[in-house]
Amino acid sequence: MKFSLIAAVALLALAQGSFAQDAADLEKITQYFENLKNKMTEDVTAFLTNQDVANQAQTFMQERKTQLEPLATQIQEQLRAAATKFEEHITPLAANVQPVVENFQQQMEALVQKLMEKTRSISN
């Protein structure tokens, strides 16, 4: 009978230890799910915050584009006018400079021709 009592006490002790281990495991699992819930909440909040920033940036860009389009059109018109005026001034200047350039080219060709003749006469 003593042996039966000792075996029963040992069995109860093992069962109690097993339940204690299960309780510790249950606590770990509960803590894991709590951490997972907190992490998911943080991630979703960060995602939604980033989406809000992206939407704000998109809205900002659209507003600035709307503001800058008239300015860009105005600058293009001014550049066209400046190009027209520049062309009006350059065309007569180019016409005046062309004879000078042609004269210079003829003088340089004559000089090169003389140098070639001198080189030939020296080499012979």
UniProtKB/Swiss-Prot annotation:
Keywords, comma-separated and alphabetical: Antifreeze protein, Pyrrolidone carboxylic acid, Secreted, Signal
Signal peptide start-end: 1-20
Major site of localization recorded for this protein: secreted
Annotated positions of the Pyrrolidone carboxylic acid modification: Q21
A single cellular component GO annotation: extracellular region
Places the protein is found: Secreted
Record's function text: Antifreeze proteins lower the blood freezing point.
Family, similarity comment: Belongs to the apolipoprotein A1/A4/E family.
Name this protein carries in UniProt: Type-4 ice-structuring protein
